[in-house]
Structures are given as C-alpha cells and as structure tokens.
Amino acid sequence: MRMLRWLILSAFSVAGAVQAQGNQDSAAASAPSASIGAPVLRTSPGLRVHRLPDEKIPAFMEADQISGDPDSEVTLTGNAQVRRVDGIIKGDRINYRRDTGDVDVQGSARMLRDGTLITGPSARLNVDTYSGEIQEPNFWIGASGGTAQARHADIFSKSQMRLSQVTYSGCPCPKPSWYIKADTVDLDFDENEGVARNGVLYFKDVPILASPYLTFPVKKERKSGFLMPTYGTTSNSGFDISLPYYFNLAPNYDLTLVPRYLSKRGAQLGGEFRYLGSGYRGVAIGTYLPDDNETGRDRWMYRTYHRQLLGNGFYTDWDIAGASDDNYFRDISELGLNTASTTYLPRRGRVGWSSTYWQTYAQVYKYQTLQDPDAPLAPPYDKVPELWLKGARYDWGGFDAEWVSTAVRFQRPLLNGRRLGPDGDRLQTYPTVSYPIVRPGWFLVPKVGVHYTQYRTDWYNRDWNRIGLSNYKRTESRTVPIMSLDAGMIFERDASLFGKAATQTLEPRLYYLRVPYRDQSALPVYDTTLADFSFDQAFQENIYTGGWDRIANANQLTAALTTRWLDANTGFERLSLSAAQRIYFQDQEVTLPAEQPRKNVRSDFLVGATAALTDTLTTDVAAQYNPYDNKWSRGMVSARWSPQRLTTVAVAYRYQRDPLPGISYQPQGQNQVSLAVQWPIHRRWYGVGRVDYSLRSEPATAAAAEQSPRVTQAIAGLEYKGDCCWVGRVVYQRYAVSAADTNTALFFQLELTGLGALGTDPISLLNRSIPGYQSVVPPTPTGTTFERYE
C-alpha cells in the first residue's frame, strides 16, 4: 500500500497570494505617517488576516490510494481525508468533485469544523457551500460541550442544520443525566439558538417538562428566549412562580421580561433593561402588580441608573427609585433577596466636571422614606440642589493644598403632616494646607485649615426647644480654624511566631488636634450626626460626620500602637494587635441638640486584633471599652475555619451598648450572635445554614422590645451534587421584615449543567449569608473552536 498526497493549489492559491499582496500594498499606502513627537506603534500589514472566498480556499487530500483527475473528480480510498483551513472530512472512501465542491463519503464519515465533530455511516457534503446530509449522525458541539444523536441531519450552511428524531444533551458525562428528545431540532450557530419542536426534557430518564416549542443555546453566549422558570414560596406572598423571557437585542443592550404569579396577591409583570456603550452605561428595572388581592391596590416599584461621559471632562448620572407604598418590599420581596429592610429609596440626578486639579458637580438628591409603622423614622433632608467644588494640588513644592466648597438648599419632607425641623441654605468652604514629611521608618504631617459656614434659615416661627434650638436668627455664620499634627514611626525586627520565622513591626502613632471653641447652639442641624468612635475616626478632625453642622472644639491627643507579625518568606500578615485612646485637655462644649457633653479626660479604649493562626483558621476582634464605668461600649468577635473546599464554619458575636433614653444621635443597641456553616454531610450531600439570634433582654424602647430576644434570620438548606452535570438544592429562609413581623421563604432548584436551572436560585443568598461559601459545582472553562483538532 502506498501513501499519495496531492496538493490542489493551481490558480486558487496564486489568486490568494496576489490578493494578499494587493491588500498589503493598499494598507501600507493608506497608513498614516507618524506624527512629529512621541513615536507611535503601528500594526504591520503582514500580520493581518486575509480571508479568501469559500470557493477559492485550497483543499489538501490524503489517502492510502487516490485515483482520478485532480482538475475534475478524485476518488480517495482508505484513511481518506479532505482538509481545508476551515474544516476536515474523513471516511473510508471519499469521492470529491473539484468543479462543484461535492463530497460523497462512504463508511465512517467524520467531519470536524470549529470544534464541532459530526460522525455517521455516510454523508454527502459540498465543501464550498457546506451543505449536505448525513445519515444517523452523532454530534459533539465544541463550543457548548453538548452532544446529540439523530436519525437524519440536513446541513444548510456552515451555521445552520436540521436534525430529525433527535436526542440532545449538554451534559458532558458518559451517560447524560438529562437530555431532550424532539421530533426535529433546528440549530443556528450564528444566532446561538437551538429550536426543539415537540420536545420533552428528561431527567434520570423521567420526563419533567414538555413543550411543543423549546429553545436552548448551542454556544456559551447570550441568546433570546425563555429562561428557566423560578419558583418558591413565602409566607407573605404564597406560592411564587415566574417565567422570564430574555431578549438579546444587541451586543450592548438587552431586556428581560418577567411574568410572575403570587398565589396570595395575583399576577405581576417585571422587567430589566441593561445597556452599555462607549462612554455610557445604565440599567432600568420595574415591576407592576395590579389590584393586589391582599390590599386591593396597585403595587409597583422602579429603579433606573445611568452614567454618561459628555466629553471635555463633563459627565452626568442619575439614580432614581420609587415604590407604590411603604410596605412594598416587606410584602413582595424578591426570592433570595432580603429587600424587606429597605428604608430609603434615592432620587438623585447629577451633572459634573473634573480636570487634573478641579472637580465639581451640581445635583438634586431626594429620598422616598419607607416607614415601618412599628418603628417610624424621621425622613432625612432633601438637597434641592447641592453644588460641590473641590480643588487639590499634591506635592506642590512639598505642600499638599485642598479647597472644598459646598452650597446646599435643605428641605425636609413632612411626617404625617408635621414639620420636624427648619429648612434653609448652607454655604461651606474649607481650604487646607499640609506639608507631609515621609521618610523610611517615620512620617510627620502638619496641617492647617479654616472652615467657614454661612446659614440662611427658615425657622417657620416655630418653637424648636424640643430639639434644642430656640434662636430664630435668619442668617448666621461660623469660622473655625483647624490645626493638626500627625506623626508615626515603624520599627522592625526578626522574630518568630509559633516556631516559624517572622518579621515583627512596632508602629506607634500620635495625632494632635487643636480646634478652638465657637458657639454653634444657634445653628440648625441638617445632615450631621455623631460618628462612631473607631480606629479610623480617632484620627479625624471632627467627632461629627456628615455635613459638619457642628465642629467640636478640640485640644486632644490620640495615641495608638500597632504591632504585626509578618511571615518571613511571603510577607503574609499572620497576627496584628492594635490599641488606641484619646487624651482630652479640655471639656467638650459643642454638642448636637439634646447631646450630653463629654466631661472625661480620656476616651474609651479601642483594641483590635486579627490573626491567621493557620492557613485555614482566621479570627478578628474589635472592641471599645469605657474605663470609667468598666463596661464595654461596643464589641465584635468573629472566627472562620475552612479546612477544605466546600467546608467552612463562621461564628460572630456583635455588641452595641444601648444609648441613654431620649438620645437619637447614637445607633440602637445590639447584642447578637451569628453562626454560618457549609459542611459535607455524606458523600454527595452538603448542608448549609445560618442563624442570627438577638440576645437583647433589656430593650431601651418599645420598638426594641418587639425584637427581644428572637431569631432575626435563619437559613437552612441541603445541596446534593449528582454526577458531573446536575445539582439539587432546597433552602429555607426566615427573616425579619419589620420590628414585629417576619417572612419565610422556601427555595427549590434543580441545576442542569449545559441547560440552566429549574426553580429559584439561592446562590446569591448563600454567598451573602455564609462567609466563604463555595458552589458545589466548580466553574467550567468556556469551550472554544480549538476543543478538538485532528
């Protein structure tokens, strides 16, 4: 037996070479000349891809025996193949007509193109038009990993074919757990769509879904069509089922419509529109439920976000949301998304500009406040409008200079027809200059600034004594100089930690702040509150946060000390210990309305620690201790153990001391323990869960009494990992929706690799609730046209 190899090039390859050369010449002629100045890299025309027409692509033939005329008809016998740059055809015997491109394959037909392999006992194909037919074909689709068997296949083009009496599966297992049987299946690879007519979805050989018209993707890309239905149940809405339809409108925008049925409330329609372009992006979502069965009212919500670059440093953006009523998110939360705690919906629009040294914007910022009848809230002030300007120049002859100015008109919405405070205008400007001195092992940063504020207030001739305000002056101003000095050092030494070589650091830091007293009792309070004392706040210029309607007088020194143990080989931080305290040289005289001034000469102690004692165990501790009454003001302790994949245990304890009665500028107390777990139970079974339990036993308010003690959130679930292409999940969730009410939800999901998921996806819930959660299905790499090569 002899091996012959004939190469058919003739005029086709010559024409291709002439065309390629011509393209190179024209490309070179049209290339722009390099501009004077910095050199510019240009792509060589010789590196460009030049495609020939299908009928001019040369073909290579190989077989044990070849006979015939290469200019007309050739017969290949024994290990025969016809190979082109865009595909290959193999068989026991191949008859090839060069003039028409027709190929007749007999025995062990095998065709490979773009990673998709088709086999069968015989086939007829035209290599120029890539059309033909195959008897009893088997398919391996490279881009998606899917497989199919059919009685007959008609191939219409490179991208379109029709299969008759088909069994299709996207499961890569030797014995697929799921498959679709259909009378016919039309595949369109350009449109990324498979259409099965009279199709039935089987799982474990049991039919679970039938449809006269079923679509599915043939590549791991977006396509229009119905998504898998989601379903579950909640105590507030009953049985919940939705059937989303996805519109792949264009590469840069799409639309999803979500018809949804809630057994206790009725039918709802939701939608999400996403778009992305050169210099802009955005999303718009909304839902509408007419005539809620429970309330008798129409229920709806919407949210739209957009950001766009306008050129020359200008930009605009908005974030606008709204809901039909206060209880919308408590009654109709999305499955798996605990939106019941949503309190404020933003309504903001902004236009801005930025350059190297300056930034500015003008915006209107309003809110819709969703009230909880068991714990009503005072609505925040609207900013209608706000103008903001910042200039900054760093390392300017060694100096850092900043200038920040704002001008705001504040209006507060009424609460049940009652006015809760004055309205007015506020102008602020704050220029600062600092001179950072940074050297190896130490730093020193002196800083000075002057904060000026001008108010024009509408008091509405009301008596505001109840909030500490009784001065009705229309205009008022305040000028406060602020001076600070920040200094620190870093020492290092060789050490050991648990018998392992380490580098230990010692990092002392001192921060001195001087702010003279200015009487501010006659100024309104719009957007200012007392900041939580923390390691970050200990080095700030003001104990108040927000818009600085109050600037506290200060003559104080903050001392802090941090030590770290770093792995000597990798630099990984194994252990960190920190402590800080303020020392006051004068009493506090500036306060918020109803705030009790500080009289102590020392602040609470701040202590913190983080430790990665092993590669699988991490702990964090942060606490605030009051040395005067020997009580903890705030604390948090957490630990996480992850000995292996799909195995994690996280525990946390959080404590916040209750504020004194009548104090509204401090957060409500908290005393809560949390436990979150992901753990393998037996072979393919995995358990997941979380519980948050409030330990509060002496609530300060009636609203807090509703919460004490109780489970604020509970999650329990099971995951079963079948073979390589399916996972089953069932998850139960119970969570608080208000100070007195709770909601429960139950999720069922069957995830079929290569097809999608039936039921409601709880993965986002588990990712948020269980630190270190991992999916039992590892991500699979995206297939390419190079999955197979012969």
From Swiss-Prot:
<protein>
    <recommendedName>
        <fullName>LPS-assembly protein LptD</fullName>
    </recommendedName>
</protein>
<comment type="function">
    <text>Together with LptE, is involved in the assembly of lipopolysaccharide (LPS) at the surface of the outer membrane.</text>
</comment>
<dbReference type="InterPro" id="IPR020889">
    <property type="entry name" value="LipoPS_assembly_LptD"/>
</dbReference>
<dbReference type="InterPro" id="IPR045659">
    <property type="entry name" value="LptD_2"/>
</dbReference>
<keyword id="KW-0472">Membrane</keyword>
<dbReference type="InterPro" id="IPR007543">
    <property type="entry name" value="LptD_C"/>
</dbReference>
<dbReference type="Pfam" id="PF04453">
    <property type="entry name" value="LptD"/>
</dbReference>
<dbReference type="Pfam" id="PF19838">
    <property type="entry name" value="LptD_2"/>
</dbReference>
<dbReference type="GO" id="GO:0015920">
    <property type="term" value="P:lipopolysaccharide transport"/>
</dbReference>
<keyword id="KW-0732">Signal</keyword>
<dbReference type="GO" id="GO:1990351">
    <property type="term" value="C:transporter complex"/>
</dbReference>
<comment type="subunit">
    <text>Component of the lipopolysaccharide transport and assembly complex. Interacts with LptE and LptA.</text>
</comment>
<keyword id="KW-0998">Cell outer membrane</keyword>
<dbReference type="GO" id="GO:0043165">
    <property type="term" value="P:Gram-negative-bacterium-type cell outer membrane assembly"/>
</dbReference>
<feature type="signal peptide">
    <location>
        <begin position="1"/>
        <end position="20"/>
    </location>
</feature>
<dbReference type="InterPro" id="IPR050218">
    <property type="entry name" value="LptD"/>
</dbReference>
<comment type="similarity">
    <text>Belongs to the LptD family.</text>
</comment>
<dbReference type="GO" id="GO:0009279">
    <property type="term" value="C:cell outer membrane"/>
</dbReference>
